[in-house]
């Protein structure tokens, strides 16, 4: 289907998901591996900088550590997994696990450049930090990607409306389905 009007007056539910937020303003951004690409099998080195300490970034860092790799988390905010709607048991466990296993976590730190074999970040004190790494995984979030605008007969659900977690997107879809 190339045009929503092909459905006539029937309601249409669009669940086209989201696209990764690419950090195009960061020199060397093209050297990064997007989080979903890693999850789909893209190989990484032994020391991996994970850019983004939200749920996806932390779960990827956790998986890397379980595989015997050395993750390093770089997060702009002042805490890991700070988004709303995440199960407290998950976020608390991840924070505590990283602390217990001495996983390097850089909070209030911004990625400045991706180089071959390292990244340069700016810490909360304004000073640059050089972090050696073999690979860089970008987990900088997602941007809704709807195919059409919401209207009387067009309903957006899931990440194309607002990026969320599995629970929130399923709830939104259920609400729309019940209203139709």
Where are these regions (language model features)?
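Short polybasic amphipathic segments
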Residues: 117-122
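General small-molecule cofactor/ligand-binding pocket signal
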Residues: 33, 104-106, 155
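Short, conserved catalytic or adaptor-binding loops enriched in Gly and charged residues
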Residues: 25-28, 95-102, 150-151
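Acidic, Ser/Thr-rich peripheral helices and adjacent loops at domain boundaries
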Residues: 94-95, 136
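Rossmann-like dinucleotide/flavin-binding elements
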Residues: 1-5, 11, 15-25, 36-85, ...
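Phosphate-coordination loops involved in phosphoryl transfer and adenosine-cofactor binding
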Residues: 29, 42-48, 108, 116
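A conserved beta-strand/loop element that lines the FAD pocket in flavoprotein oxidoreductases
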Residues: 1, 99-111
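Charged helix-capping and loop-helix junction motifs
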Residues: 88-92
């Amino acid at each position: 289907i190339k045009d929503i009007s092909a459905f006539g007056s029937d309601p249409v539910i669009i669940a086209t998901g989201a696209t990764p937020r690419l950090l195009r303003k960061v020199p060397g951004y093209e050297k990064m591996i997007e989080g979903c690409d890693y999850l789909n099998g893209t190989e990484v080195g032994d020391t991996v900088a994970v850019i983004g300490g939200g749920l996806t970034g932390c779960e990827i860092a956790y998986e890397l550590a379980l595989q015997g790799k050395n993750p390093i988390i770089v997060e702009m905010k002042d805490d890991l997994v700070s988004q709303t709607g995440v199960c407290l048991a998950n976020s608390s466990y991840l924070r505590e696990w990283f602390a217990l296993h001495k996983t390097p976590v850089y909070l209030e730190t911004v990625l400045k450049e991706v180089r071959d074999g390292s990244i340069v970040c700016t810490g909360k004190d304004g000073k640059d930090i050089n972090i050696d790494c073999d690979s860089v995984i970008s987990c900088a979030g997602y941007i809704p990607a709807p195919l059409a605008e919401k209207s009387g007969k067009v309903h957006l659900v899931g990440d194309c409306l607002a990026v969320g977690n599995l629970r929130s997107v399923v709830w939104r879809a259920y609400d729309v389905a019940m209203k139709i």
